[in-house]
Design a protein with these regions (language model features):
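Short hydrophobic clusters on alpha-helical segments that form packing/core surfaces
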Residues: 108-112, 247, 268-269, 273, ...
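Conserved active-site tyrosine of GNAT-family acetyltransferases
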Residues: 135, 140, 296, 301
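Conserved N-terminal entry element of GNAT/NAT acetyltransferase domains
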Residues: 1-35, 148-168
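Conserved acetyl-CoA pyrophosphate-binding loop and the N-cap/start of the following alpha-helix
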Residues: 96-107, 256, 260-268
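Conserved beta-strand-loop-alpha-helix junction that forms the acyl-donor binding cleft
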Residues: 122-131, 283-292, 309-312
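Active-site acidic-Proline motif in GNAT/NAT acetyltransferases
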Residues: 80, 92-95, 253-255, 259, ...
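Conserved GNAT acetyl-CoA-binding A-motif
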Residues: 112-125, 274-284
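Acetyl-CoA-dependent GNAT
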Residues: 11, 18-23, 28, 35-88, ...
């Protein structure tokens, strides 16, 4: 049984929007990425930002998956920007055969060629088995992973001394952190080096507009016997109306690695998060950093969602 992709008729848009919004909310909530009202607001932003003109938005395509008997089998929603194609949602009414999924993928590649895109990306939630079946085997790489630890355990931090970063240390930290994030963004395959540098600068200015005095931002240095061994940067945010800590940067100094300081810094992050009243702590890790992924999973962090990328 073959499949084809057909544009969503305008008269079906409202029903599609309602069911897709419900699905996006559920994916965020069930994965743990965003709980409660946070998931509702994030899903709503997708429609506001990506479909400002509804079904007529030129930078999005909403397509029905139809079999050769004329039965709708699901929908896919793509957004396009700067030569990239983003799979926002793939909803299957029932499981499809491997052959049908392969046919569907060939149709997707045809759309990519029509739109002259150079990259396809997709956010994959951990529990979305059908979307994973659809994307598996086509050469995607994992650009980044969102992870969460909840509740926050009370673990020993005695291996390192952690203290607030000084004003004297901040400038060199800021330069190294911004440059390091740009390098990792480019290495993840998501952005070109120039795009990565611009995005890193934008995020740094957004998070730390007032440097060390920025509310909700906590920066630390870690030392052993008076020698600096690493840095830690935490943002205190809200998650479902509760304080939530997010690790924005954590790094063991060159020459101090493979001595257990990375694990000790993670324990310190948990302690500082608890001191700020947080009951959960999250992080983002690039997919190529398998050593960090392994450490976080050993510490009890669980995967919530992955960003997949494919150059075409």
């Amino acid at each position: 049984m073959t499949v084809q992709l057909l544009p969503l008729p305008a008269e079906h848009f409202d029903d599609w929007r309602a069911s897709t919004k419900e699905r996006l909310i559920r994916l965020r909530q069930d994965s743990g990425l965003l709980p409660g009202q946070d998931a509702v607001e994030d899903a709503e932003r997708n429609f506001t930002e990506l479909l400002p003109e509804g079904v007529d938005t030129r930078t999005s395509r909403i397509l029905r998956i139809v079999d050769d008997e004329g039965q709708e089998r699901g929908t896919v929603w793509f957004a396009f920007k700067d030569g990239r194609m983003f799979l926002i949602d793939a909803a299957f009414d029932e499981p499809m055969t491997d052959e049908q999924l392969d046919e569907l993928w060939e149709l997707v590649l045809g759309i990519a060629a029509e739109e002259l895109v150079t990259q396809i990306s997709a956010r994959l939630f951990v529990q979305d088995a059908e979307a994973r079946r659809f994307l598996d085997g086509h050469g995607f790489s994992t650009s980044s992973i969102q992870m969460l630890l909840q509740p926050i355990p009370d673990r020993d931090v005695s291996a390192v001394d952690v203290s607030p970063m000084t004003a004297e240390r901040y400038p060199s930290f800021a330069a190294a952190s911004e440059a390091g994030f740009a390098s990792e963004l480019a290495a993840s395959g998501r952005l070109t080096p120039d795009e990565a540098a611009a995005e890193s600068h934008r995020q740094f200015e957004h998070e730390l507009p007032d440097g060390l005095d920025t509310p909700g931002q906590k920066l630390f240095t870690a030392s052993v016997d008076g020698a600096e061994v690493g840095i830690l940067w935490l943002a205190i945010r809200e998650r479902d109306d509760h304080p939530h800590a997010f690790i924005l940067d954590i790094e063991v100094a060159a020459g101090q690695r493979r001595r257990g300081y990375g694990r000790a810094l993670m324990h310190a992050a948990e302690r500082e998060a608890r001191r700020s009243g947080a009951d959960s702590i999250g992080l983002h890790v690039f997919g190529f950093n398998q050593g960090a992924v392994d450490l976080y999973e050993q510490l009890g962090y669980r995967r919530l969602a992955e960003l997949l990328v494919l150059d075409v």
